[in-house]
Amino acid sequence: MLNKNGACRRTAGLVLQLCMFLVIAMGKILCYDNCMMKNILKNKKIWKIICILAIIAYTLKNLFVGADTDEGYGIMVGYRLAMGDRLLLEMWEPHQTSAIFTAVFIRLFVMLTGGVNYLNLFLRLIFFPIQAGVSAFLYKTIRRTVPQMDENVAALMGLLYYVTTPKSIFIPEYSNLHNWFFALMVLCLLRYFGSKDSEGRTVAGKLRWLVLAGIFMTCDVLAYPSMVLVFLCCLVFLLVRRSERKWKELCAYVLPCVASAAVMFTYLLSYMTPQKMLEMAGEILGEGSHQTTVGEKLLGWGSSLGEMAMILLCALLVSLGIRWLIEKVWKKKLPGLLQLPGMLFFVIVFLIQIWFWLFSSFNAIYPQLLLMAVSLTGCYTYLRRDKTEKLFYELILLAFVNYFSVLLLSNWGPMLLVTYLILGAVAGLVCLGDYWQKENTAGKKAIQILCLILVLGNAFSYTWLILGSQEYHSYVIQNVRGINREGLRAGILTDYMTAYRYNNNLAVWPEAVPDGSTVLYVGPSQFYCMLGEHKQASPDTICSMIYDERLLDYWKINPDRYPDVVVFESCYGDIAQEGENSFIWNWLMEDFQPAERKDYPYITVFMR
């Protein structure tokens, strides 16, 4: 009862803190002179310099600061494939097909350097140029398909994509690979269906863009298999669309997908039968950390979506209340650009988002409410206000299909996955910008400010907080106190304890785990197995792995993977999994029967 009352008091305190923050912030905004709001972008050079500095800070911080077990998983699954483990048969990771792309970079690095020193940093160096390239392609595509849009607005949309990633992870792993391939596929479709001349007239697209879209769609399915739903939606779009070239368009889009799928299945069938492939697919789908009933999943989605809807609804009601109070009761006008439909709502949502970044318990970048708000408002604008940008409205719908497809395979809730709506937000900005410019002479400036808010806000959120810290919601300035000195994470700055633990494990690993061992690592940080030359005894390396009977199935199919060394994550001999109710501990004592136990500060090693 005391705990319940304490939780209620904490919740009430946070709500009160949020209300006070909003009142003070909105008071400041509404008290500003109209001239300030009208001229906020007057000095474009200063704002360009601010944007450049924000992008530099964002890039440098995320290149050198922060480390996370999710990032380690993304590297480890690629490393397994690069070192010769086979898909499906020896690798049971749920995201293993995405490792095809990661493994290329890892294999190249290992060939050039002979080891994994600085590998994490190298993969981050690969990430940022690719992210910048997709952002530049987005900018050029917006300029080609929406020629009436201001060049600065299109540039800000490109920058918004650059500073928004699905997670606070900056390597070519499954979430970022999906983000790139989905964006490239969509942008190729826009190039084909939405190309316009300088006078705004639609011109016939070239079929090569549909071919490229099909190739990127295939890559996207490999990065995130549930994206097959996006493929089906695009297929339906091509089928129902009236076109004299319908069958050519279908062939151009579908044949690359079919050909790529045929190559993939041919490769898999080169070392296993179709029956074995189906058996392995069942084992992978049975991965414990992603196993929930339909009811549990729907309940979790409903709770998260309800929370998000409540926040956005409250923001909308507050914005309508402020407008009514000022215009109807006080008989005055809102300051400057806040008069535009929806602008006050976006400002309030942004202020709530800032509060989350500064004071809430959410880690790093979440929950990105403004991306959801802009996407939904873009839909509303097209349906109820201005039906000019039909193609971008359809893009918003496709972005929501993408969002739902990610939810199907993820063990994260809807509020944490809003970052996958980045292209929906960009399309929403296009719909809003076109409508605002028709409604008000200040519409051009308003969409510039909204884009600027999004860019600088996201650059701040991804820069302000450190990922992977021992403290869940921790600030970079206060917490960066350590450096990972050698090995996989060499050169990366983290909080003191994360670096200390890594460096300690790095120092003891050669003594604790002999090279050539077949190692079962029990714990979320399986990337430590990359500190030596080992064979992987675990079916998968996901950081949320459940250690259950799947291990026995894996060793029955792959008897050469039965471990001779078992490593538990621990704290000075204290093992979380120790106890008679633990499957892995019972297996260790009854079947593995260790002959030797070695306790180190952060790992405990058992040998036969």
For every predicted segment, state its role.
Residues 125-147:
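Transmembrane-helix motifs of polytopic, lipid-linked glycan transferases
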Residues 194-199, 229-262, 320, 324-329:
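Perimembrane helix-loop-helix junctions
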Residues 49-54, 245-269, 300-317, 332-349, ...:
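Hydrophobic alpha-helical membrane-interfacial segments at the cytosolic entry of transmembrane helices
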Residues 188, 203-225, 231-236, 259, ...:
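Membrane-interface alpha helices of multi-pass inner-membrane proteins
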Residues 177-200, 209, 216, 372-375, ...:
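Specific aromatic-rich, kink-prone transmembrane helix
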Residues 120-124, 158-180, 353-364:
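Aromatic- and kink-enriched transmembrane "portal" helix at the membrane-lumen/periplasm boundary
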Residues 63-77, 86-105, 117, 272:
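Extracytoplasmic catalytic/substrate-binding loops of multi-pass membrane glycan-assembly enzymes
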Residues 93, 227, 457-545, 563-574, ...:
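Short periplasmic/luminal acceptor-recognition loop of GT-C membrane glycosyltransferases, typified by
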